[in-house]
Amino acid sequence: MSSGTQSIADLTTEIKLTSGSIPPPLVGASTTVAGNSLYVFGGRLVSSRQMTNHLYILNLDTLVWTQHIAQPDSPPAPRPRYFHSTNLFGRYLVVFGGMSYSVRRSSQSLCALDDVCLFDLELMTWKYPDIEPSIYAPQSRYAHLAVCSADKLVVMGGQDMSNQYINEINVFNLTTLSWIHGGALSRQYGAYRAVAFCPSNVDTSIMSTQPFWQENNQPHNDLPLCVYSNYNFTDVTRDLQSFSPLTSAEFKDHSMDMSGTSLPPGLRFPSGDLLGHHMLLTGTYLTPTHRSFHIWALNLANLVWVRIDTGSILSHGSWNRGVLYEDKQKFFVFGDKSRDLLEDYNHRQVNFAHVAIVELEAFGIYSYPKETCAPVAQELGLSMLNEPSMADIEILTDDGRSIPANSSVIALRWTHFASLLSEKLENPGFKSLSFPESYPVTLAFLQFIYTDHLMTAQQHYPQILSRLLVLADVYNLPRLRLLATHALHQILTIQTASMVYETSALTGRTALQIRALRVMINAKKMLHQQQQQQQQNIHPQKHQDYPSMDSPSMFPTQYSTQRQSEEDGDFFQSRMSPSSSAVRRLTGSKSSTTASPEPSSVYNMVPSPKVSKSSNVYQSQRSPQFAQRKTSLVPSISQNKVGSMSPTFERPNMGIRF
């Protein structure tokens, strides 16, 4: 790995020291994120080998630990345990199973549990539901898989006290507090080598084909489950299955559908989290020559794997457990940077003194902006903007043009304008406002104000998107900042990388800036490789073909989970020579590219914006892709000038001994 790439990877990860009542090193404790808090429950102390039922809480913003001390009159904590599961359901933490002391409380006598305990996150108290006996009640187990979806808790696999795998799946209704379903499993699943996840909340609108977890004749499944497992770590086998525990016991196998430039190695005690349309797989990778904590991402739309390259940070020290901080699009890896990973793994020890924070957005992994209103409401907003009779103010642009608008509508979403308007109330009548932007940028800004979305082709020109992000930063418009950042991610290519880099640097969008910088470095690396290839060619031909810009050998795909066209230069339809002036200008230019575009430059390049849940893009073959107004028209786009840019395993039934 080159030093340049190494330094870029290191920009995405930072190590911080936690403080407060830091949990001691634990074995088999559960870690669950709720909001901006991480809850660590139970586990076995490494120092004394005693199990605990302590609850530690970490504020993910301040990185300060506190230990929960219950009120004297509140219910006691559950029995000490380890290798249990804890899932989030609304305002409750749901704890199931695990290994604990037998009733005699002898450290030499252990047992597996089958109980369900609830922790109320609002009252900060424990609750023990009265569960009626059921034929679907699960067998006691530990080191199992558990996933919560809607109001169902699904428990599958795990081991008994003889270290035998339990080939059973059970479903618990968290509303009625009863076991409602059970069945047999044909495979062995456990926390040592598998993860389960429920993709019911994944946004499928961006997927060009039906999600792999849905039946062809069943468009919607209330409780789809997916299980990824890896085993035989010397020659790793990777399995991916999907099934519906409530409707069918049949597992659909998707193992052969997974692909990627490289695939995950065998990860021990893996964990899985969902963010956007990706499943994040993390775990410990150990070989005689390599030991580190790995983070991988599976694109659920096309089942392509990519590695999240965190540089050299996670290659040193002992990093043991990762959790997703979804609200901030970041991944937290806990450990101790001064300890040895192999030694801690042999004791199954998890440390909480240090945390490595990985910026996932820099790899194109993030939650897409959600719609705030229906498409018909967005269209109605555009219609209002295009109706001069509803205007009571005139917006004057810096290129001498005007746009009639309604001040009440603008004031609802633009607080700065509302304050300016309140100062002029003593002067009723038609008003005018000078806006220091060009007409195309001003119109795109007003289209956002009226629709709360970026939905027109006008708004998705790269130059206009850059100015919209700057305006969002200047006027503190969080919604516009979110939408513009997302749109810039989608149109990030070699051609737009320098402009996106500069705009993100000006507006403090660090993740977008790092991603754009990676594209530029990859472009420069590609150009250098092309030059070397030309020099090493002993018999050059007059008309020589050079490697295609979208050649996989040119760009390592582990840097992004977006389509290769976004970062690998896939948008070139022809092969380019090393003397390509466009690439040379890109890799060497330091000039400003975020100035307000002139109309002539704006309309010569019309990208095809990527449709996402946050934008319903009008894609028409006719030139003006937004409604015309009666007072002032956007210059027409000549058809011959419009060019598109790509946006965006079996073994004996013997378990693992702990």
Which ranges hold each PLM region?
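Fungal intrinsically disordered, low-complexity serine/threonine- and proline-rich regulatory regions
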Residues: 1-7, 221-222, 278, 373-382, ...
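A short helix->beta-strand "capping" segment at the edge of beta-propeller domains
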Residues: 2-23, 69, 130, 255
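Beta-propeller and closely related beta-sheet repeat lectin domains
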Residues: 24-31, 42, 79-86, 139-146, ...
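Glycine-centered tight turns/hairpins at beta-strand boundaries that repeat
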Residues: 34-52, 90-109, 149-164, 184, ...
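Beta-propeller blade signature
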Residues: 52-64, 107-125, 166-178, 236-249, ...
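Conserved blade-ending motifs and adjacent loop-strand segments that build the rim/top face
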Residues: 183-193, 252-270, 301-327, 372-379
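N-terminal BTB/POZ boundary and linker segment
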Residues: 352, 359-405, 451-463, 551, ...
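Canonical BTB/POZ domain core
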Residues: 392-493
